[in-house]
Amino acid sequence: MTLQRTDEVLTFTKEHYIDKTQELKKGIETFPSIFIEGAAESGKTVAVNMLMKEQKDTDFVLFLMDREKDDGSFIRKLSLIRRRMEKEKIWVVCENMNQPLSDAKAEALVEFVKRLADGNRCIFVSREKPHRKILELLWKEKMHLISQKSLLFSIEEIESICKRNSLAVRAKDIFRETGGWPGCVCLLARMFRNKMEAGESATLSEMRNSYEVAGYIDSEILGTLSKRESDFLEIGSWCPWINGKMCEDIWKISDGMETIKNLERKGFLIECGKEQYATAALFRKEACRQNSKRKFWMTVGAWYEAEGFIKEGLFCMTNANEKEALKTFAIRNYAEIPFIDMGFVAAERWKETIPEICFLRGMNCYFSQNIEGMDK
C-alpha cells in the first residue's frame, strides 16, 4: 500500500495517447466505485492516471493486489484508511486484481465501498471479470463497470494521433492491424515518429512485424494468459473459427465456451458469426507457437464438414496437404465447392471421369472462362 498525491501519478506521453477518461468520469461522479476490466496493455492504468491527474485536492492510496497476500493485514489497512477518510478526501485504487481474490478480501472491499461518503472513491483495475461477491456492488448501484471496449482507440482517435505526430500512415490501416489496442497503437506511433525523425522509411507491415513490436505483443500481452487461454487462442488462429461445441466434440473440453467468452471479453477473440469466434488479427501471428499438423487439419476439417460448414472444411482439407483426402472431400461436396472457391484449380489435375469430378472441372473452366477446357 502506498499513499501518493495526484502530482506523483505516473506520467504518460500525450503526443501518442488519447484521453479515455470520459467513461471513468461518468462512473466515478455517479457511483462510489468503478471497476475497469481489460487485458494487459489495454490502457486501464493510463486512463486511471489521467483521471487522477485532474483530482487536484485528492490523495489516493494504491494497493497492488497481487502483493497483498495476507487477508488480515489488508483488512486492517482498509480500516485505517476509513478512519483517515473522516478528515481527508482519499481515493483508493486497487491495481493488479488479476489473481483470484479471496472471499475475505472481496467481502471487506464490498463493505468498504458501501460506507464511502463525502467524495471518497474506490477504483478497481483488473484483467479479469469481477469476483462474484464484488458484483453485489454493481447490483446495488454502488459500482460502475467499465469494459475494455470503451478503452480501445477508434479510427478517428488514431487519426488525431497521426495528425499530431505528422505520421505518413493511414489511421484505418493502423486500426486494421491493432484493433485499436492502445498499447500497440502508441508503440507503433512512437516507432513511426522515430523513423521519420531519423529520415528513414518503413511500411506499417514492416513495423508491425518488427522485433520490437512482435516481442511486445508476445511478452507484455500474450504472456499474461494462462496456458489454456494460450492454447485456445492458438487454435482460434489456425481455424476459421471455433466454438464450444467444437471444443467438446474434438478435444472433450466440456467448459470450453467459458474460456472462449473470457477471451472475447478480454479482446483476444472476436465474434465473427453467431457462436463463432476467431483470434483477433493483432494476435494471430504470435499466437501460433508451432506449425499445425496434418492430423489437426484432417480432424478439424471433418468436424466442420459434419456440422455442415463446407467452406471451413475445404479450408482445412486444403491446408492438410493430403491430395486424396481433398479429392474425396470434393467429391462428397461437389455441388457446393465451385461456389465457395471459384478458382478451385485442384480439379484441373484430376483425370477421373466420374460425374462429380467432371462437374468440378467443368465449373472451374466456366469460372476461369476456359471454354475449350469444358470439352475435355
Please give the residue ranges for each predicted region.
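Conserved P-loop NTPase "ATPase switch" module shared by AAA+ and STAND
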Residues: R83-L109
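Extended alpha-helical scaffolding segments used for macromolecular assembly and cargo binding
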Residues: K293-M374
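Alpha-helical sensor/transducer elements of the RecA-like P-loop NTPase core
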Residues: V46, A108-D173, E177, G183-L188, ...
